[in-house]
């Protein structure tokens, strides 16, 4: 287990990557890719408005901007899932459920509610997709919001999180979603807590990125 508490996503990222490369357990994925993993990584961002993209993030600012736009407004690309669809248009029977509208409505009605929750996993779809060797299912599983002391506190749970290539985009995009909800509810935005059950780095696939951005950690790969 790893716990990190930092003011910004960037400062958390800069601590997270060396920690996984140094202390992570070597795990071969079901697709035979070598990773280093720390189970149950919890990261608290105490000043989420600091959304500067870290210089060592391999995919850069444009990737973060694109992810955030797709999360909030959707994508024209067709996948077995996308987070915008699962949060804003969750497929259930013949319905599409807007879980974000529900969260805003719930918190406007009951400021102390513990029920402002959205999920992404859809058993009817995702169990079948998971049977496909390369099927793509949501990594983000749950988003919950609490209003305490006049501020909105956000917690997210990922079943699986690529620390090197995905964490920064995931966190900044979801913080932007949280800021949107806070504005709709009329409160300030508090902290962002990011829980990844499997937080990992693909050490062979992303070796060149590790070599370029974290060369001091190469000694931990063998």
Swiss-Prot record:
Compartments reported by the entry: Cytoplasm
Main localization (coarse): cytoplasm
GO cellular component: cytosol
Annotated GO MF terms: thymidylate synthase activity
Top EC class, one word: transferase
The EC number(s) this enzyme carries: 2.1.1.-
Active site: 139
Gene3D superfamilies in the cross-refs: Thymidylate synthase/dCMP hydroxymethylase domain
Keyword Aminoacyl-tRNA synthetase assigned: no
Annotated GO biological process: dTMP biosynthetic process; dTTP biosynthetic process; methylation
Keywords: Cytoplasm, Methyltransferase, Nucleotide biosynthesis, Transferase
Quaternary context: Monomer.
Function summary: May catalyze the biosynthesis of dTMP using an unknown cosubstrate.
Record protein name field: Putative thymidylate synthase
Naturally occurring in which organism (per UniProt): Methanocaldococcus jannaschii (strain ATCC 43067 / DSM 2661 / JAL-1 / JCM 10045 / NBRC 100440)
